[in-house]
Amino acid sequence: NTVSSFQDILMRMSKMQLGTSSEDLNGMITQFESLKLYRDSLGEAVMRMGDLYSLPSRNGKWREQLSQKFEEIRWLIEEVRHRAKMTENSFEQITFMQALQLLLEVEQEIRTFSFQLI
């Protein structure tokens, strides 16, 4: 379940102390939270069939937002991969690997939702 996975990853990341890069980590946490909200809103739009057709017309920039979210996901994937390679702490490695898996799952979910909205 990606909802509990999000909560678990965010909790684990908030416990990490990465020294001078804690500001970067907070930024990653914020992006994860934003991504979760976006994924949830797309899922809700797909579930409510009335919104399925009104979302694109109500929000003319939804394709642009979708493209931006995919860019954010790609950036986060690269950042998480980099951090997983750099750390020697096994707790952090596991957390980053789980975050990477979650990002890939969420990317697929967003793709699925967006195809249903097109």
Swiss-Prot record:
GO terms for biological process: exit of virus from host cell nucleus through nuclear pore. GO terms for cellular component: host cell nucleus; virion component. Disulfide bonds: none annotated. Pfam families: Flu_NS2. It is found in: Virion; Host nucleus. InterPro entries: Flu_NS2. It comes from the Viruses. Keywords: Host nucleus, Host-virus interaction, Transport, Virion. A motif (Nuclear export signal) lies at residues 9-18, 82-91. Belongs to the influenza viruses NEP family. Binds M1 protein. May interact with human nucleoporin RAB/HRB and exportin XPO1/CRM1. Mediates the nuclear export of encapsidated genomic RNAs (ribonucleoproteins, RNPs). Acts as an adapter between viral RNPs complexes and the nuclear export machinery of the cell. Possesses no intrinsic RNA-binding activity, but includes a C-terminal M1-binding domain. This domain is believed to allow recognition of RNPs to which the M1 protein is bound. Average number present in a viral particle is estimated to be 130-200 molecules. This is Nuclear export protein.
